[in-house]
Amino acid sequence: MVGMNIAVYAFSIVAARSLIPREFGALTALLGIILVGNVAALGLQVATARRIAVEPDRTNEIIGATTRLTLLIAASVGSAVALATFALTPLLKLESYWPVVLCGATLVPLTVMGAQSGIAQGTARWRSLTAIYLGNGIGRVIGGSAAIAIHPTVNSAMIGIAIGAWLPVLAGARLLALHSSVHGFVSRRGLVREAILGTHALLAYFVLSNMDSLIARNRFDVHDSGLYASGLILAKAALFFPQFVSVVVFPDLARANSHHARLRAVSLVAGFGMLAVAATAILPKVALILVGGNKYADMTSRLWLFALAGSALAVVHLLVFDALARHAHGIVILLWLAVATVAGCAYGLGVGITGLVVTIAAVSTILATIVWFAPAESRSPS
């Protein structure tokens, strides 16, 4: 997963350096739509991985049920996002309806990838999971970068991203058919219910973690939204890098009867975050090089705030996965309250670049603290 995140980060650098701030701001908002739309894939991944982890004797049947669901969910998500172009295009100040349609096209293979990842994760097939994640990162950096090199526009970048999104599906193609010949059967109802609950929580989280890119595109002028997007490169790096912890420890969190696994995981993610913030604060000019160079020089003194916001969101991400592993779906209420708080501050107080990133950092830190100290919910039967 680290390799995937490095590749995705590399694409962000290529895009920041190749596109003018106006175009890069639009691309960042579109990538935010993909991340939010990808919650169905993550919900399917979490539900599949958890079911296999707690019911290993029913692995064959669970994989069969997942396979039957995947194409339906993929087609539904892709179509819904594509149709949303009529609302999102004017909201994000885009010049064409096609970029959002291409977001929908990208989400079809990404949803299939989610099912494949859940099977690999639940069965501890780490090599297969690594191949899938690397395929996602390589597909993004090669497809997106090649498209930008041919024609440096948002439309071109999204075409490359949509094509590259099929590479991880090819890498994990055998997983969905792994046990399709087994005659055992498990009802899809329980899997669907768990996937919906997981998707709801992940939707709330990804709205929280991506809403600032959409707010910046909607509220700021196109130049300032591009500046904010450059800072988000660093925020996403701080957010995505430690996510391998959530993936690796999720089966342990699902089976654990104590909080030791949770404590170890949170400590590790928080430690990565502190290193990221310290490094950015001490070496801001080096960080500037990593987010696009001198044309974003106005952001130099504020980059550490983006590292802080991303690090806080990384801890929240882990705590969300911990809650899903424990079937503690009540966390979704706190996530939506956090979303409402950020939106209220952004639009009610009329914040600028600094105010928006500080709002994200503060709300995420408070949310992580509340979730950590909240009484643990009892596990539901699997």
Question: Where would I find each of the regions flagged by the language model?
Answer:
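Interfacial segments at transmembrane-helix termini and the short loops linking adjacent helices
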Residues: 21, 87-103, 222, 282-314
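Interhelical loop/hinge segments that connect adjacent transmembrane helices in multipass membrane
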Residues: 127-132, 154-161, 167-209, 380-382
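Membrane-interface junctions at transmembrane-helix termini in multi-pass inner-membrane proteins
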Residues: 51, 109-131, 255, 308-335
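Signature of the first transmembrane helix
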Residues: 1-42, 82, 196-219
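Helix-loop junctions and terminal segments of transmembrane helices
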Residues: 41-57, 231-258, 325
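Transmembrane helix-bundle signature of multi-pass secondary active exporters and lipid flippases
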Residues: 31-39, 228-247, 276, 306-313
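Hydrophobic alpha-helical transmembrane segments
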Residues: 97-104, 130-178, 353-377
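Interfacial transmembrane-helix starts/ends
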Residues: 28, 58-72, 192, 257-271, ...
